[in-house]
Amino acid sequence: MTKLPKDAAEVLLFNTLTGLRPTEAVLSIQLIKREPEKYINKETGMLEHFRYPDLFIRKTKKAYITAFNEVILDVADKADTSSWMAIRSQLKRRGIESHLKYCRAIFATYLRKQGIESEVINIYQGRVPTSVFAAHYLKTNIQDDRNRILKAVGNFYE
């Protein structure tokens, strides 16, 4: 990460801490900066992607929610808000290969190794139908899942 421009490195870190897809991560950073009052739910500690279905709820790829804390918001604040393709081009010019899909895989694998259930990881990574997400978000203790995920992810940056 030391070879990267600081703002591009922050995008990679944000991507790893949230488990979002590359384009979703950049969109999320943009929304955190542009529309925090609508996008950031401080009461639940969630970034609420589902409020932007045209951006995050697509036919085959979905992102509903992301747990956040102040560290994650600080990373987003320092991150580049260009498109993913612009960031990728910037890295390519420096001779740095960019495989952001690995950030998402690191997130999921690490959470699983920390004892987070696959079902919870699948919800956070948008690998469930909208109806399953709605049932989980409304009926389970989302705060408990959020706290466990943030505790596990906290080891990335401590």
Residue locations for each model-derived region?
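Alpha-helix N-cap/helix-start motif at helix boundaries, enriched for small hydrophobics
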Residues: 11-12, 23-28, 121
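Active-site/catalytic core of tyrosine-dependent DNA strand-transfer enzymes
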Residues: 60-112
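Conserved tyrosine-mediated DNA breakage-rejoining catalytic core shared by Y-recombinases
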Residues: 18, 27-70
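Active-site-proximal segment of tyrosine recombinases
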Residues: 25, 98, 108, 115-127
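Basic, Lys/Arg- and aromatic-enriched nucleic-acid-binding interface segment
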Residues: 1-22, 104
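Catalytic-site neighborhood detector that most strongly recognizes the C-terminal catalytic loop/helix
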Residues: 125-158
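Generic structural marker for isolated residues within well-ordered, non-membrane alpha-helices
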Residues: 11, 87-88, 118
